Amino acid sequence: MNIFELRLKILGAIGRYKAKRRLKKLGYCGKGCKLGEPTLLSDYSKVLLYDGAEIDNGLTLISYTGRFIMKKNSSTAVGLTVVTGNHGREIGKWFNISAAEHSEDIEKDVVVEEDVWLGTNVTLLSGVKVGRGATVGAGAVVRTNVPPYSIVTGNPAKVVGFSLKPEEVIEHEKALYPEEERLPLDK
């Protein structure tokens, strides 16, 4: 082994060690999760990743009390931004976003359900729930809930289609989920 190969091997080992340390800081980390770097997290404990969840490089989480929850087998491309709060305004007071003022923020969890794909540079805003099997296109700003198996794009994100027909959703759910975990499709 030459010096170049040795250096690559050492750098790889350091990278794997750092990745494991980052995952241990999370509020919850299931099996087979990945969290790229760099990440900008106000609080690692506010991130919950379930089995097989993968976040590519460049996650930014802006949160004081809200959590970011990513469920099983969901993935992101680079540059995901998650904002769990909104700044309030009070009559008769100057607008101030200093750290001391964040106690007045309205914070809500952001939830990404199972089997979701989030494209490059997606922004998820406070209280949003991205439904199971949804696809969020690159650059989308999601400020309202996303229906299961829908495709959303734009700013603000809007439904532009569905990835599966209803009969395909039934087949897909049967293949992947136990009966008690399947979406109710009669609504």
Name each model-derived stretch.
Residues 1-32, 73, 80, 85-95, ...:
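Terminal amphipathic alpha-helical/low-complexity segments used for targeting or macromolecular assembly
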Residues 18-52:
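Short linear elements at protein peripheries
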Residues 40-49, 54-128, 155, 162-164, ...:
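Flexible, glycine/small-residue-enriched loop-and-beta-strand segment within the central core
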